[in-house]
Amino acid sequence: MSSPAQYRLEVARTLLATRMFKVERPDRSLRALRTLQRWGSNAAAAYTVSAIRCPDRIALVDERGTLTFAEIARRTDALAHGLAAAGVREGDGVAIMCRNHRGFVEATIACAKLGASQLYLNTAFAGPQIADVLRREAPTALIYDEEFADLVSGGSEGMHRFVAWSETPAERQAAGDRDAAGAGANGAGGLTDPKLEDLIAAGDPTPLEPPHEHGRVVILTSGTTGTPKGAKRKQPDSMEPLAAMFSKIPLRAHETTVIAAPMFHSWGYGHFTLAMPLASTLVLPRRFDPEGTLRAISQHRASALAVVPVMLQRIMELPPETIARYDLSCLRIIAASGSALPGELATRVMDTFGDVLYNLYGSTEVAWATIATPQDLRAAPGTAGRPPLGTVVKLLDAEGREVAAGERGRIFAANEMVFEGYTGGGGKEIVRGLMSTGDMGHFDAAGRLFVDGRDDEMIVSGGENVFPREVEDLLADHEQIEEAAVIGVPDEEFGQRLKAFVVTRADADLDEEAIKEYVKQNLARYKVPREVVFVEELPRNATGKVLKRELSAAG
């Protein structure tokens, strides 16, 4: 373990390697330093500094066009004044339910300038979930895309409401029925609530003074096992969290990143925060489209792509000739997180795009635990990687004792991101300063972590412990299987039995017995599913996690 002095030196080296501190004009650098001293390290400071250092650089690209850092600085000052005039104050909470676009970015920065906390709502949640969250969190204001008007109508009574994005008729037609559950542009309140653009146009662009206390960031858990919790986190007091990420993922200043992962989720939001100090150009597609993502990378010469694993799966389903149509030689980094990355998929992605894939493992509460580099994924495709700079990961048994390499234990982690607990009370288990991720895993001899599954997903069948992940990964390796999920169901004789839900590829010629035989040839007999159900697709949430409770409910 390095000494504090060695650690600080490594942090400095890592940050310098990003070129974010390159001095181009001393006068601007001095102003930027003063801004950081006054504002700290939040979103307001990062974008203000970029507006000082590179005002004319493109900060954002979305369907409506481009915005420079100087334009975003002026617009978010005006928006912050407009929100304040409407009644939003320092310490208030503002709920944001937006897709990836300028409205999300500008709402976040304006709230940071006011000292208001930001609560990010999952755009895939159903109306009752949204209503439960809004009533529990009781934000002062709600900023939403007009397509979600019906979804937010329950639970938002008495709140200041603002529309971040209204689709044009052409955009609604292009979207088709993909988001029918969210209702259309004529949803409740959608045509009467003021628009952010109106607040910006009428607002005072005078820069604000820093708040006495910065607001918090609240990101919701996925809600795969029930009502989503609000994970509250304060702004970091140093740049050490950035150094942790940059120690494994070689992002550089003044490059371009396509964020396909939803920004309301930890991973999409995380890439947004990584881009801030780098003055990166963000390309923000509102909806994920596999070929459209490749087109955006090629068109904007993006060096990085942020995705959740299911997006990679959809990209790899494109015909090879479609992928070959785009010049992707600029792409240095594909950064994936949010759900399990099957080893077979990791290998296919790197065989297609080169050794540019990085896989981050963590949780909403822990933020990050480990990161797998392309070298890790080549050596051990199913690995979650190793802890980055300043991060500690330990595997503990039921008594809290550390387990040896190769042995399974509960995963605990500690890093520089401070989780302040759930907004509704409570938190995650902590042992000797390490927080539980809720998963089980093991280290190999090289120190690479492998996540075996959720600690509450373990299936006990005939007295034997089985984690679904091992069987799922094996099934995904089959050349005729696209993806699979495994659950435990009650069994009178064995207590539980394994049931597999399988999505086959278009030209597959498999039946239930062939799949059982395949598993039996590769794993212990007690890991063979007793039932195999063929389905067209697996139910997933917005970040790609399989909704196993829906599979269980389907029987």
Language-model features: locations:
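Conserved AMP-binding/adenylate-forming core of the ANL superfamily
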Residues: T35, W39, D56-H101, V105-I109, ...
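Conserved AMP-binding A3 loop
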Residues: T68-A70, R216-E240
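Conserved structural elements of the adenylate-forming
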Residues: A73-A78, A202, A231-A253, Q313, ...
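AMP-binding/adenylate-forming catalytic core of the ANL superfamily
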Residues: F125, D132, L142-Y144, R295-I297, ...
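Conserved pre-ATP/AMP-binding loop-to-beta segment of ANL
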Residues: P169, R178-G184, G189-L220, T227, ...
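Conserved AMP-binding/adenylation subdomain of ANL enzymes
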Residues: M239-T256, F264-A304, L318
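Gly/Ser/Thr-rich phosphate-binding loop
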Residues: P277, A302-A306, P320-A380, V392, ...
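Conserved ATP/PPi-binding loop(s) of AMP-dependent carboxylate-activating enzymes
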Residues: R386-G390, E399-R432, E464-V466
